[in-house]
Amino acid sequence: MYDLAILWDWIAFSVRWLHVITAMAWIGASFYFIALDLMLKPNDALPKGASGEEWEVHGGGFYHTVKYLVAPSEMPEHLTWHKWQSYTTWLSGAALLMIIYWVGGELFLLDPTKVDLALWQGIVISAGSLTIGWLLYDAMCKSRLADTPTLLMLLLFAILVIMSWGYNQIFTGRAALLHLGAFTATIMTANVFFQIMPNQRIVVADLKAGRTPDAKYGKIAKVRSTHNNYLTLPVVFLMLANHYPLSFGTQYSWIIAALIFLTGVTIRHYFNTMHKTGKGPHWTWGVTVLLMIIIAWLSTQRSGDTYEDALARELTAYEERYASAAGFEDAYNTVIGNCSMCHAREPVWNNMQWAPKGVLLETEGDVARYARQIYLHAGVSRAMPPPNAIQMDSEARAIIIAWYRAAND
């Protein structure tokens, strides 16, 4: 069992690596085509149906790009489709969600201080919210709201705020922000998979058959692509947020997430305008800085259970498994002596305001809850505690290893 813990952690690391790589490819391609589209310049010498061109230089070579409003008069034999960057990002993200927040849900997904849920119930809420969210958004885009893009965007923002609040009522702070990111990314990838790509195939098929494509497909793609454009930066923030307790360790984390979506709008508006006109509106940076100042202030408002509340809380079945294992008392004392100066509700380490990654190791319930992470980081490896903070000897690490293995025999 203990070997499986190490293997499982490496699987999670590998999938996370894949997710970051594919996300870089997707976001890079998305930003490139948005910038390219906005920088296109008209030219009377262009072929019929072409709306603009752009010359670029990169890596010692020159590139000449021509955009057609619908399509060229004759389709080329080879056509590159930009879709798998999006698909693999979502698929790897979904796999990572399952590995960390479903399989490891007793620790990372559920917060017993908020609601009393079985793990399977949390997983159903996790998966169901992503599915229902897409269906609701898709229905809105297919309604008359599509004729008023600004109103549609505002309603999308309202949905994101509601989901942010809802996730924070059920899940841990880390899981709440991660799920909001997954919710948003699901909308973005589903836009590509269910709308943009199928409609593009219809256009290509019409052209090959000699038919004039319906302009409505371009309109649909523009609405969905615009949403994806403004949602990209907040999704990246939400991907990174689980590494920074200041973003999720407060009762106002759902408001922080909402404000991050607004910063995504202001930043993208600047670059969209700059690519189109050559000069971006500088006021957007002032608004962005103001929003980040508000976010920083909100992050200082502490929340969560107190030390007394944590002591009084009844252990979950998962925690009881480790708290009742042989060697727990020695392991608990070892963790308290080596880790709790930082991993406390009020850390005593100089200039530390929050426990690293939000991991609290003060009570017996805390230590039992994070048993697997303690085993991996302070038992079989020397990742924790930092050597410049405290020197943890091999005997202390052996105590942790023996306790964890005893609980899993």
Show where each model-derived region lies:
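Membrane-embedded alpha-helical bundles that constitute the cytochrome b-like, heme-associated redox core
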Residues: M1-K222, T226-Y252, I267, N272, ...
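Composition- and surface-driven signal marking solvent-exposed, interaction-prone regions
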Residues: A29-S30, T250-W254, T277-W285
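Generic structural hydrophobic/aromatic packing signal, biased to beta-strands
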Residues: F31, F62, L136, Y167, ...
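Aromatic- and Gly/Pro-enriched helix-to-coil junctions and flexible linker segments
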Residues: E74, W81, A94, Y101, ...
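Small-residue-rich segments of transmembrane alpha-helices in multi-pass membrane proteins
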Residues: L155-M163, T284-I295
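Pore-lining and gate-forming transmembrane alpha-helices of multi-pass membrane transport proteins
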Residues: G181-T186, Y252-G264, T284, T288-V289
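Interfacial loop-to-transmembrane junctions
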Residues: H269-L291
